[in-house]
Every structure is written in C-alpha cells, then in structure tokens.
C-alpha cells in the first residue's frame, strides 16, 4: 500500500532475502542493486519506487506492491507438490554451518559449504567426501532468525546456516513446511513456517 514515501537509493536492496518465486518463471533467484532487482532466470528487471510500487522495466509487473507478490509466492508454494523435487535441487546456496549449543555458544562446523534445497531434504556439500544429507523426515522444525540465518532442529541438536547478506533462509522454511503439510495429509494446509 502506498501509505508514504520511501526515500532511499537502495529501496530494492536485499529483496532476494524474501523473494524466491518469479511471477513469470516460478522458483527462481533474484539479484538486487539499489532500487532495481532482476530475476536470474528470465532476466526481467523491476524497480521498487518511492511510493513502494513495483514497476517492470519494459513490461507490466503483475503486482503493484510487494505484499501482493509475497501472497502470490505463498500461494505458489502451497500449490506445488514439493515431494516431486527430489532429483535436482530447487536452490543452491553457500553457507557457514554451526552447531548451536543452547545457553552457551555456537561451534563452527563448516565454512563456505554448498547448501542444496530439495523438496524432501537439505544436502550439505553433496557429492563430496564430507557430504551431509538432512532428510526433512528427521527434522522437528525449521526457522528463520534475524535477517538471514536458518536454524534446523535435528533430533536433540540445533544447527544454524548463515550465508551472505543476500542469503534467503525463508525458502528453506517454506519448502520444509510445505513438505510437512503434504506428508501429514494436509495438502491444503497454508502454514509455511515463521
């Protein structure tokens, strides 16, 4: 909603922390710079305006405001059978992996690890000698902390994944909870995590 003026030279900066579904391509990644962001698949570029409206460069962006786009993204995920995405990863990121020691500290386990998100698991350094496969069926919860940290609750342990300033932890949470809804027979469940 255009309820004021957003004055900044970086209005679109880090939009990729929350956006991962392109209205034209489906699951995708975005890259932002200043007031603009682009889909890495189709290359369409849009501008985030001072009035908080999104405008396509040379095309009509289907959503006027980010909230509408976010609702579309949630509907897209809820309409997707993520259990069909087990052969190729939906997303590949780079992250540092830490073990969270409750009421104490964090212990770094891996730096600059490749993180792959499938429709039923997270893989860390897949295909390498130290590969770690984390089946969704063995997780009790997945959550976003701060701007871009992902916590997974794996048995009695908690692990944290942190990437660059542009890392999107939200997609991991949403895909996990979509998988969980399907596995629990709640195919129309709307909850995609917090």
For the regions a protein language model found, what residue spans apply to each?
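Anionic N-terminal interaction surfaces
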Residues: 54-115
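Acidic, Ser/Thr- and proline-rich intrinsically disordered linker/docking segments
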Residues: 132, 136-194
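Residues that act as N-cap/strand-start positions at coil-to-secondary-structure junctions
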Residues: 107-111, 128, 136, 146
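Short, surface-exposed charged micro-motifs
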Residues: 45, 112-114, 141
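Structural motif
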Residues: 33, 118-119, 145-146
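Short hydrophobic/aromatic-rich beta-strand segments that constitute the beta-sheet cores
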Residues: 122-126, 152
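Cys/His-rich short segments
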Residues: 4-60
């Amino acid at each position: 909603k255009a309820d004021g003026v957003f004055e900044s030279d970086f209005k679109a900066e880090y939009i990729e922390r929350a956006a991962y579904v392109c209205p034209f391509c489906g699951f995708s990644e975005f890259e932002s710079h200043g007031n603009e962001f682009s889909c890495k698949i189709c290359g369409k570029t849009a501008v985030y305006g001072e009035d908080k409206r999104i405008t396509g460069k040379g095309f009509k962006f289907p959503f006027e405001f980010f909230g509408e786009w976010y609702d579309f993204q949630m509907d897209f995920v809820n309409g997707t059978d993520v259990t069909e995405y087990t052969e190729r990863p939906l997303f590949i990121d780079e992250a540092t992996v830490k073990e969270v020691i409750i009421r104490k500290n964090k212990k770094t386990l891996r730096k600059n690890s490749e993180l792959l998100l499938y429709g039923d698991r997270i893989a860390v350094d897949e295909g390498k000698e130290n590969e770690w496969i984390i089946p969704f069926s063995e997780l009790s919860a997945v959550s976003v902390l701060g701007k871009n940290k992902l916590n997974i609750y794996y048995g009695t342990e908690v692990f944290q994944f942190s990437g660059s300033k542009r890392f999107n932890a939200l997609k991991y949470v949403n895909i996990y909870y979509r998988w969980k809804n399907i596995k629990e027979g709640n195919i129309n469940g709307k909850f995609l995590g917090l």
